[in-house]
């Protein structure tokens, strides 16, 4: 039976909630949270103990380059790793946000690793 948009969103949210139960970010090893929309991708390093964002990056930034959305996602990962290094962060826990680890989500993670962030 084909699923509609509402069912897909609810399923992704259930998966995200179950992942978040076992994942926790600290100021030493924050959580790299990913949100993917149809046009953009957003990533942020979150300290769950304090409840605030340490640094973030998205495809809305001017320094993000790439011809395809996957290339842009890799560039976002590299930009986030650079900003994390400036903030003194070298390790993070990867929170894929309920999305499959493929395509733009995977490219972002690989870009962050290439930028020097240990996931």
Swiss-Prot record:
One Pfam entry name: Ribosomal_L18p
InterPro entries linked: Ribosomal_uL18_bac-type (IPR004389), Ribosomal_uL18_bac/euk (IPR005484)
Region spans: Disordered: 54-76
GO BP annotations listed: translation
GO cellular component: cytosolic large ribosomal subunit
Taxonomy, superkingdom: Bacteria
Metal-binding keyword on record: no
Molecular-function GO terms, alphabetical: 5S rRNA binding; structural constituent of ribosome
Record key words, sorted: Ribonucleoprotein, Ribosomal protein, RNA-binding, rRNA-binding
CDD domains hit by this protein: Ribosomal_L18_L5e
Function: This is one of the proteins that bind and probably mediate the attachment of the 5S RNA into the large ribosomal subunit, where it forms part of the central protuberance.
Family statement drawn from the similarity comment of this UniProt entry: Belongs to the universal ribosomal protein uL18 family.
Subunit structure, interactors included: Part of the 50S ribosomal subunit; part of the 5S rRNA/L5/L18/L25 subcomplex. Contacts the 5S and 23S rRNAs.
Name the UniProt record assigns to this protein: Large ribosomal subunit protein uL18
Organism: Salinibacter ruber (strain DSM 13855 / M31)
